[in-house]
Each structure stands twice: as structure tokens, then as C-alpha cells.
């Protein structure tokens, strides 16, 4: 018998908060823990080690992270947990404060310390003081990095770059994640090939700004060049682009999305506002004319485009007139999906010191008005799809009822864009099938699987 066979494995529970980019970090971190010594569990009460991968982007995310940490501390007091590890953006930002305020936390890691997880657990086991182990955010994983999938086998995320050079005045991310660091095209292709071979039908490319991919490498790498290589992977079905900065969307990229069948006709382009004065204070590199021209070029070349964006309401100095302009812009109906954020005053950002901070009550009112306006737009755009046949990725039985299958159309990104409820027909989980849309709501679609032999 091997020595490792006689040692009881330690159970590890990973709680990952925030965005998909954070989820990839969590999967990589778990990959660094040898399977012959550690066993992953989703039951925190049974876990010997709990790792909380925090988000510290805005106030709501920080509050969720703190609440989750307090719950994990309770497991350490009353459950099996003997080691509590905190990593991610919140610990990168507030390691010193957290070390003082949360003595129950054994190890604090930053966003750049992912590959040190095993080293630090072993150091803690030896009695070394490794509570504050937050380093500079310089890490970047590649195709050789071990990774434990937590997403369904048929859909996955691939982080093509880390960090950001955009320096928007409201955003703390460059301080938490560091400057732009792009992977090589060969590395991304190798990872996607492996994931597709393991059954992935949908690959979602992510970064803080995917359009900046390659700008730091000085080897000619670009998002367009990467996509040309990825579409050569024969078994890949859907390739989705998430988080594209508007001034990085070239005509060449639009043409690729328009003509390459494997690239979803879907763009997620955070615009943040439409008023030039607000955009300038946000330190965005685009104005209203550029935004409108971009939307026109995208819609003209990709008639079937699904366009998602996000806006910030209540930015410092945003007047009633500036908000009214944003509201009218949304009501024009350009977008299939919109995420709205109330401005969060983040310390150590230029916007935090701007005059004319907007009261929380006004932010909330503007948020509600903008969301309601987009709900009406989304409802109309979804109703226009009734009668069409669309490809749908089947994800399993609905959370609402086991009588219905559910999935996502090619128009719906994971986690943020609603679902398709399948009222007739059968398919396997992970299968992409044609579906005729029979009904819709603001966010979801309803339809029946089409027998292709009858078409």
C-alpha cells in the first residue's frame, strides 16, 4: 500500500463569489491541491478546509463577501473546519484590516497568490505564521495549469488575459488585478482544445477587457488572431465573447463575428453612460458619437446580433438632465440585455473625491427607472423572436419544475441572460438542439424542440 493511500484526505470546500473571472481563479486554485491528499466537497459543515474566494469590486460585493466570511467562521467554530483561507479581491484590497478584524482567518491570499495555495497550507501545518501572504497581482495561468472544473461539462470559461490598463475613474480593478497580462494564442488554443475534447460545447472567453488581448505582448497577438485559430477547432460549437471595451471593437472583429458560424452573434459591451460629460468624468475613451456609430456598425453588419451592455447611474455630478438622456437612450431600444449598477464610491479611485456625490435615494430611483425601461425593451425584443427556430443548449431539468427541460439559446450567456423553458421534445444534457420559440417574457423564452427530420 502506498503511503498516500493510508492518509485520510482532507476535505476542502471552495466558496467563490463574484464574476466568472473569479470562478476561474477558484478552479485553478483547487487544481493546485493534489487529489491524493485533498477531496473537494460542497458541504461546508463537513469541510476540514474552507476557502472563500472573495469579490471586492463594489459595495454590494464587499458586503456579500463579508457575510459569507462570517458564515464560514461559524463553520470553523461549530463544524469540522480547522483551516480558513480567504483569497480574492477583498483580501487583496484589505488584507491588513482583515487580519486585525478577523482573527479566525488562518491565511489571507491576494489575487496573484493562486499558485501558492498548497505551499501556504503546508506552511500553516508546520506552525508558520502565514496569515498575511498577499503579494503583487502578477499571476497569469496557462494551459499547463491544473484546473478543477466547477461549471457543467458542456459550458466553460477561459480567461485569456488578466488585469486592466483602462483606468476608468470609478474602478478599483487595476489596483486589485494589476496591469494587462495576456496569454499567448498557443496557450489559449491548447486549453480550449482540451476543454472541447472533454465535452465543452460552449466556450466563453473572458478578461477584464477582451479587446485589449495581446496589446502587452509585442508579438502581434490580437483577439482577432486568437479567434481565427479557435474557430479551427472542429468540435467547438459556440464561442462567446464577454466584456469588450467599446473602442477596442474593430471592423475586423465585427466581420469575424458576422461571418464565423462558431462565434456567437453576441457582444457584451459595457458602455456605462451615453452623456459625453459623464463619460469624460468616468475617464472613458468614448463619447456619444462613437457609441452610436459602433452600435450602427454592429447592427448593420450583424443583423441578428444580441447586444448586452451595462450602465452606471448616480455617478458623481450626474444631473437630472444627464440621467434623462441615458434613460431616453435606453428607451430607443438598442439593447437586448442591460445590467444597471448604482455608483459605488470606492476609496482610492479618482471618482471618490469628485464633488457632487449623488444621494443614495436618487441612485435607487434612477436604477429602478432604467431597469423598468429596459424590461419593456427586452420584452419587445423577446416577443419578436416568437415563431423563430433558434439553437438551444440543453442544461437539464428546470429549477421550477422537473416536468420541463431548460437551457439557453445562443442569445443567452450563462448566469446573466435568462433561460429557455422547453415544453415539448427530449434531448440530452449538453446537447445543442433546434427549438421553435412559442412564448416569451422579459428575460426568458419558451419553446419546443424541432424534429429536424420534419423541417
From Swiss-Prot:
<comment type="function">
    <text>Catalyzes the methylthiolation of an aspartic acid residue of ribosomal protein uS12.</text>
</comment>
<keyword id="KW-0949">S-adenosyl-L-methionine</keyword>
<dbReference type="GO" id="GO:0006400">
    <property type="term" value="P:tRNA modification"/>
</dbReference>
<feature type="binding site">
    <location>
        <position position="19"/>
    </location>
    <ligand>
        <name>[4Fe-4S] cluster 1</name>
    </ligand>
</feature>
<dbReference type="Pfam" id="PF00919">
    <property type="entry name" value="UPF0004"/>
</dbReference>
<keyword id="KW-0479">Metal-binding</keyword>
<dbReference type="GO" id="GO:0046872">
    <property type="term" value="F:metal ion binding"/>
</dbReference>
<keyword id="KW-0408">Iron</keyword>
<feature type="binding site">
    <location>
        <position position="171"/>
    </location>
    <ligand>
        <name>[4Fe-4S] cluster 2</name>
    </ligand>
</feature>
<dbReference type="InterPro" id="IPR012340">
    <property type="entry name" value="NA-bd_OB-fold"/>
</dbReference>
<dbReference type="GO" id="GO:0035599">
    <property type="term" value="F:aspartic acid methylthiotransferase activity"/>
</dbReference>
<dbReference type="InterPro" id="IPR038135">
    <property type="entry name" value="Methylthiotransferase_N_sf"/>
</dbReference>
<feature type="binding site">
    <location>
        <position position="89"/>
    </location>
    <ligand>
        <name>[4Fe-4S] cluster 1</name>
    </ligand>
</feature>
<feature type="domain" description="Radical SAM core">
    <location>
        <begin position="150"/>
        <end position="380"/>
    </location>
</feature>
<keyword id="KW-0963">Cytoplasm</keyword>
<dbReference type="InterPro" id="IPR005840">
    <property type="entry name" value="Ribosomal_uS12_MeSTrfase_RimO"/>
</dbReference>
<dbReference type="InterPro" id="IPR013848">
    <property type="entry name" value="Methylthiotransferase_N"/>
</dbReference>
<feature type="binding site">
    <location>
        <position position="164"/>
    </location>
    <ligand>
        <name>[4Fe-4S] cluster 2</name>
    </ligand>
</feature>
<dbReference type="GO" id="GO:0005829">
    <property type="term" value="C:cytosol"/>
</dbReference>
<feature type="binding site">
    <location>
        <position position="55"/>
    </location>
    <ligand>
        <name>[4Fe-4S] cluster 1</name>
    </ligand>
</feature>
<dbReference type="InterPro" id="IPR002792">
    <property type="entry name" value="TRAM_dom"/>
</dbReference>
<dbReference type="Pfam" id="PF04055">
    <property type="entry name" value="Radical_SAM"/>
</dbReference>
<dbReference type="InterPro" id="IPR020612">
    <property type="entry name" value="Methylthiotransferase_CS"/>
</dbReference>
<keyword id="KW-0808">Transferase</keyword>
<dbReference type="Pfam" id="PF18693">
    <property type="entry name" value="TRAM_2"/>
</dbReference>
<feature type="domain" description="MTTase N-terminal">
    <location>
        <begin position="10"/>
        <end position="126"/>
    </location>
</feature>
<dbReference type="GO" id="GO:0103039">
    <property type="term" value="F:protein methylthiotransferase activity"/>
</dbReference>
<comment type="similarity">
    <text>Belongs to the methylthiotransferase family. RimO subfamily.</text>
</comment>
<feature type="domain" description="TRAM">
    <location>
        <begin position="383"/>
        <end position="451"/>
    </location>
</feature>
<dbReference type="InterPro" id="IPR007197">
    <property type="entry name" value="rSAM"/>
</dbReference>
<dbReference type="InterPro" id="IPR005839">
    <property type="entry name" value="Methylthiotransferase"/>
</dbReference>
<feature type="binding site">
    <location>
        <position position="168"/>
    </location>
    <ligand>
        <name>[4Fe-4S] cluster 2</name>
    </ligand>
</feature>
<dbReference type="InterPro" id="IPR023404">
    <property type="entry name" value="rSAM_horseshoe"/>
</dbReference>
<protein>
    <recommendedName>
        <fullName>Ribosomal protein uS12 methylthiotransferase RimO</fullName>
        <ecNumber>2.8.4.4</ecNumber>
    </recommendedName>
</protein>
<keyword id="KW-0411">Iron-sulfur</keyword>
<dbReference type="GO" id="GO:0051539">
    <property type="term" value="F:4 iron, 4 sulfur cluster binding"/>
</dbReference>
<dbReference type="InterPro" id="IPR006638">
    <property type="entry name" value="Elp3/MiaA/NifB-like_rSAM"/>
</dbReference>
<keyword id="KW-0004">4Fe-4S</keyword>
Amino acid at each position: 500500500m502506498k503511503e498516500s493511500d493510508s492518509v485520510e484526505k482532507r476535505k476542502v470546500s471552495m466558496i467563490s463569489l463574484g464574476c466568472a473571472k473569479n470562478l476561474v481563479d477558484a478552479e485553478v486554485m483547487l487544481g493546485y491541491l493534489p487529489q491524493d491528499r485533498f477531496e473537494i466537497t460542497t458541504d461546508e459543515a463537513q469541510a476540514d478546509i474552507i476557502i472563500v474566494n472573495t469579490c471586492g469590486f463594489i459595495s454590494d460585493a464587499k458586503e456579500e463577501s463579508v457575510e459569507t466570511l462570517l458564515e464560514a467562521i461559524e463553520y470553523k467554530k461549530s463544524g469540522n473546519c480547522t483551516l480558513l483561507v480567504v483569497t480574492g479581491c477583498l483580501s487583496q484590497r484589505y488584507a491588513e484590516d482583515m487580519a486585525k478584524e478577523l482573527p479566525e482567518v488562518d491565511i489571507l491570499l491576494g489575487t496573484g497568490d493562486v499558485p501558492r495555495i498548497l505551499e501556504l497550507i503546508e506552511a500553516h501545518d508546520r506552525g508558520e505564521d502565514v496569515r498575511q501572504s498577499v503579494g503583487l497581482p502578477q499571476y497569469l495561468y496557462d494551459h499547463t495549469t491544473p484546473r478543477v472544473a466547477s461549471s457543467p461539462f458542456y459550458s466553460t470559461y477561459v480567461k485569456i488575459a488578466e488585469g486592466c490598463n483602462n483606468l476608468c475613474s470609478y474602478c478599483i480593478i487595476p489596483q486589485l488585478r494589476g496591469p494587462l497580462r495576456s496569454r499567448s494564442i498557443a496557450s489559449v488554443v491548447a486549453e480550449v482544445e482540451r476543454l472541447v475534447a472533454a465535452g465543452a460545447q460552449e466556450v466563453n472567453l473572458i478578461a477584464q477587457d477582451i479587446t485589449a488581448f495581446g496589446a502587452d505582448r509585442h508579438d502581434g497577438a490580437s483577439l482577432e488572431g486568437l479567434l481565427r485559430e479557435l474557430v479551427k477547432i472542429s468540435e467547438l460549437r459556440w464561442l462567446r465573447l464577454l466584456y469588450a471595451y467599446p473602442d477596442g471593437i474593430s471592423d475586423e472583429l465585427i466581420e469575424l463575428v458576422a461571418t464565423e458560424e462558431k462565434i456567437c452573434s453576441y457582444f457584451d459591451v459595457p458602455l456605462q453612460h451615453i452623456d459625453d460629460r459623464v463619460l469624460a468624468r468616468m475617464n472613458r475613451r468614448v463619447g456619444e458619437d462613437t457609441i452610436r456609430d459602433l452600435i450602427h456598425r454592429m447592427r448593420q453588419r450583424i443583423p441578428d446580433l444580441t447586444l448586452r451592455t451595462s450602465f452606471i447611474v448616480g455617478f458623481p455630478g450626474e444631473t437630472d438632465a444627464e440621467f434623462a438622456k441615458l434613460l431616453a437612450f435606453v428607451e430607443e431600444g438598442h439593447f437586448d440585455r442591460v445590467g444597471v449598477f448604482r455608483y459605488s464610491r470606492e476609496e482610492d479611485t479618482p471618482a471618490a473625491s469628485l464633488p457632487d456625490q449623488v444621494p443614495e435615494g436618487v441612485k435607487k430611483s434612477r436604477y429602478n427607472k432604467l431597469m423598468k425601461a429596459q424590461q419593456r425593451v427586452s420584452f419587445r425584443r423577446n416577443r419578436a423572436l416568437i415563431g423563430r427556430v433558434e439553437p438551444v443548449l440543453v442544461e437539464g431539468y428546470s429549477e421550477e419544475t422537473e416536468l420541463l427541460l431548460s437551457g439557453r439559446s445562443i442569445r443567452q450567456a450563462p448566469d446573466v441572460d435568462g433561460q429557455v423553458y422547453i415544453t415539448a421534445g427530449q434531448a440530452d444534457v449538453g446537447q445543442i438542439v433546434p427549438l421553435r420559440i412559442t412564448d416569451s417574457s422579459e428575460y426568458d423564452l419558451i419553446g419546443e424542440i424541432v424534429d429536424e427530420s420534419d423541417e
